[in-house]
């Protein structure tokens, strides 16, 4: 007769389900791992392996195994990179968890559990990160079908409310805050009071002292309308793009200097090697301190000039609540100030140099040393000489088919026809084009043709609204003709003094100028790749990397290999040839499958704007010439606004500016586009807004009309007509409705 007690103490049959892993460590600079999980029952020799998942840090397996577990047995679940396991003993290890015998009984039948991955041993040098999700079920409780589980939901409850985890194209994890509309690389954590046992992941070694927590009752950390989430992401991209649209950013501090802030918010600079501190910004030469401030233009938004009790001027940054003695405009515009000083020195030298018998040998002020506004003025003069005195470039399109109809008409024309005065008409609308309709056309068209939806372009990064050519654009058989069209439109915008609403990466503009690309250009486009390549150059890679002169590219899910040089797959990267490898890699990264597309775009652009006219500009200046200023300076807007039938003290005017200051950057841009036809500001600021017959300031016109009417815009005259609304709330509501809902032109 069998003994029930003896049977109960024998091996127990359990079903282990290995569902997925998350946030695995990325050990290769340029490739993602091929993870698989290995299950070993220590003591009995049972061993199982999951399938291999290609190129991911978040593999999903959902595979189960029936295990016989003895009383003293433990289970080790390890994760490995299939690409590396054949290299040497222990290669490819990505982390493991070990379930001790007494913890197995407590894990059993508790649903899916999240376990932190850890090292094989405490002295192991391998970097480990991430979690694995598993479940243990008694064999007699296993049903005919398993529960379908969304792996992503198992991890969401670790994040604070309103946060979302995303992954960039290079595999790096970033965190999106939907409340503040910001992104960051560091994983956000909940306050201590928010942590509770159901949300805490398990330790990698699980024993009787480790609390067992389930995920069945976990709630998703962020749930929202997908359309709202997409709108928030686009708004974030828009803000990030516009915040970077400046001519030149302040240069880095000299080596050995650090910028610090006192407890009172005063900014100072410390030389770490000598311990000497100073209030003066070391990036700015001291002889520039007495420069005329009017030459530098207005202060940045949120800054104010004040005087100390002794009369010394200092600057208050209300954005960061700090003060400093150095004018913030000096560091941002240092290149212009130095250029201007060099120009004056050259002029002084010319005055003391005797006249040369040959005029060609006389000293002149180099054109490239003039500031951007002067160079742009010269460009406009040279372009105006090319414009025919008679005839028009007439284009009639519908708003619904603006992309295709514009493409067909523009591509039919000869390049010299595109130089004629631009006359745009929207079908079914009676607007006369004195500039405003053309600005509206370019605004709408640029939104369409640059939209990644059409496959011609793609976002360069997940967190900023800059574009690059899509290497897989060939899915459209006519893609080269469309790139030719895009180049023509960009050239037409520059030629006729308008702007494209959108922007590319700075290396794109550099290539458009015919300049070579360097490693430094990679930093803004792909920071992770830039850091990896810099690390290769600055460190001895002997025995560390096993790369060859062959790189991989993911094209719609298919992994394609590209050799950087002939037979590159068999040429290892060594300490001796690593500089060549980095140079070839950078060139391939920026021209990866886009050579033909870029040449077609460049051809269209140069058909309208000859390349020799752009030799004096750098890539940042070219970006501003094509796209204008994205950052809207409300102070400059106010100063350069004309009032008609109202005064600065009129309620309509005060309420209008109150609404503008309340708007975020995106709504300010929409308001500007509603009134002027373009969301971009000229390089010289609002004083350079163009109307039907030359410069025309932004105009607020109070009209005698029913207060139930919406404000009305006259884009050809940069004028907005506003009825005498009874309250700020009504003006705000009507103004918002007008800029969000209305479109179309009419003739009065």
UniProtKB/Swiss-Prot annotation:
Activated by NDFIP1- and NDFIP2-binding. GO terms for cellular component: cytosol; membrane raft; nuclear speck; plasma membrane; ubiquitin ligase complex. There is a cross-link at residue 119 (Glycyl lysine isopeptide (Lys-Gly) (interchain with G-Cter in ubiquitin)). GO terms for molecular function: identical protein binding; SMAD binding; ubiquitin protein ligase activity. One of its GO terms (biological process) is protein ubiquitination. SUPFAM superfamilies: C2 domain (Calcium/lipid-binding domain, CaLB), Hect, E3 ligase catalytic domain, WW domain. Keywords: Cell membrane, Cytoplasm, Isopeptide bond, Membrane, Nucleus, Repeat, Transferase, Ubl conjugation, Ubl conjugation pathway. InterPro entries: C2_dom, C2_domain_sf, E3_ub_ligase_SMURF1, E3_ubiq-protein_ligase, HECT_dom, Hect_E3_ubiquitin_ligase, WW_dom, WW_dom_sf. The active site is at residue 716. It is found in: Nucleus; Cytoplasm; Cell membrane; Membrane raft. Induction: Up-regulated about ten-fold by activation of the TNF-signaling pathway in vitro. It is an enzyme of class 2 (transferase). Pfam families: C2 (PF00168), HECT (PF00632), WW (PF00397). Pathway: Protein modification; protein ubiquitination. Auto-ubiquitinated and ubiquitinated in the presence of RNF11 and UBE2D1. Ubiquitinated by the SCF(FBXL15) complex and TTC3, leading to its degradation by the proteasome. 'Lys-48'-linked polyubiquitination mediated by TRAF4 at Lys-119 leads to SMURF2 proteasomal degradation. Residues 1-119 form the C2 domain. Its EC number is 2.3.2.26. The second and third WW domains are responsible for interaction with the PY-motif of R-SMAD (SMAD1, SMAD2 and SMAD3). E3 ubiquitin-protein ligase which accepts ubiquitin from an E2 ubiquitin-conjugating enzyme in the form of a thioester and then directly transfers the ubiquitin to targeted substrates. Interacts with SMAD7 to trigger SMAD7-mediated transforming growth factor beta/TGF-beta receptor ubiquitin-dependent degradation, thereby down-regulating TGF-beta signaling. In addition, interaction with SMAD7 activates autocatalytic degradation, which is prevented by interaction with AIMP1. Level decreases under the suppression of SCYE1, suggesting that AIMP1 stabilizes SMURF2. Interacts (via WW domains) with SMAD1. Interacts (via WW domains) with SMAD2 (via PY-motif). Interacts (via WW domains) with SMAD3 (via PY-motif). Interacts with SMAD6. Interacts with SMAD7 (via PY-motif) and TGFBR1; SMAD7 recruits SMURF2 to the TGF-beta receptor and regulates its degradation. Does not interact with SMAD4; SMAD4 lacks a PY-motif. Interacts with AIMP1. Interacts with NDFIP1 and NDFIP2; this interaction activates the E3 ubiquitin-protein ligase. Interacts with TTC3. This is E3 ubiquitin-protein ligase SMURF2. It comes from Mus musculus (Mouse).
